[in-house]
A protein has these predicted regions:
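Long, low-complexity, polar/charged, intrinsically disordered or flexibly structured peripheral segments
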Residues: 154-198, 206
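Generic alpha-helix detector with strongest preference for long hydrophobic helices that associate
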Residues: 8-11, 15, 83-86, 90, ...
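An N-terminally biased module of ancient metal coordination in phosphate/nucleic-acid-related enzymes
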Residues: 1-69, 77, 185-220, 225-256
Length: 256
């Protein structure tokens, strides 16, 4: 976090925000750094929700691959974060479900990994300690796979061969040399829907959109809908394809 604030000072940034899915574990250290560096802190949070009627009729919202799934943000929350007792219980329940999914994906990853090299194995606790603060997410799993491959195979050719065997179906490794690109490739081949280590999320891992908005408002924040609009090929999701209907839907959700 020191580097983030150093860069902010160098670029004369007056306001700096922090954001993560479901959790606010970084708020305290972020707040202390903001005071130390005299930069105004903006506390934010992000949620993954589920709109069941949209899922049932196949309507994609702002996740282009999963009908009914909605990404939703809260901006400018109070510090300390206090969503209320019942909302905190619900948040903790969602986090537990999310981590159960991550553990199941690690189990599937380990099956793939040990089939290639029985001496290698991933651990949920190690991934959380090494790559995450509290909550393990898909990106942390991808990073763990990359780091595991790099530590075991110093030769790029052997490393690529190892990863290609994990991918299966005669797929090749194209993201080598760029950590972010390689981790995205690992996510696409192993962790996304259709991937060899994919585990579908339980509906209990999602909050209802009404609950999400209530948590944000109770925490002093502003409910915000992050608009996807289109992808690289210029295609819109069904939810966002008509601006008037999009405006109406967001207004009904008390957004804007």
């Amino acid at each position: 976090m020191d580097e983030i604030f150093r860069m902010a000072r160098e670029e004369a940034i007056a306001v700096l925000g922090i954001n993560d899915f479901f959790v606010t574990h970084g708020y305290e250290s972020f707040y202390k750094q903001s005071l130390k560096n005299r930069i105004f802190p903006l506390f934010n949070i992000e949620f993954t929700g589920l709109m069941k009627s949209e899922k049932a009729n196949g309507t994609r919202i702002n996740d282009p691959n999963n009908p009914g799934r909605i990404y939703f943000s809260g901006k400018g929350l109070d510090y300390p974060f206090n969503p209320g007792f019942l909302n905190r219980i619900k948040l903790n329940s969602v986090i537990r479900e999310s981590q159960s999914q991550m553990k199941a994906m690690i189990t599937k990853l380990n099956k793939l990994i040990t089939d290639v090299n029985p001496s290698l194995k991933l651990s949920y606790d190690e991934i959380r300690n090494d790559f995450a603060r509290e909550m393990v997410r898909e990106r942390h799993l991808a990073k763990a796979v990359r780091v595991l491959a790099e530590k075991k195979y110093s030769d790029p050719g052997e490393r690529n061969q190892f990863l290609a065997k994990l991918y299966g179906e005669n797929k090749t490794v194209t993201g080598n040399g760029d950590h972010a690109q390689l981790e995205n490739e690992i996510r696409s081949n192993l962790l996304k829907s259709g991937g060899r280590a994919f585990v579908e999320e339980n509906e209990a891992a999602f909050l209802d959109i009404g609950r999400i908005i209530k948590i944000i408002l109770n925490s002093g924040g502003i409910p915000c809908y992050p608009v996807l609009l289109d992808d690289a090929k210029g295609r819109f999701t069904e939810f966002e394809s008509d601006p008037s209907k999009l405006h109406k839907a967001l207004t009904e959700l008390r957004v804007g």
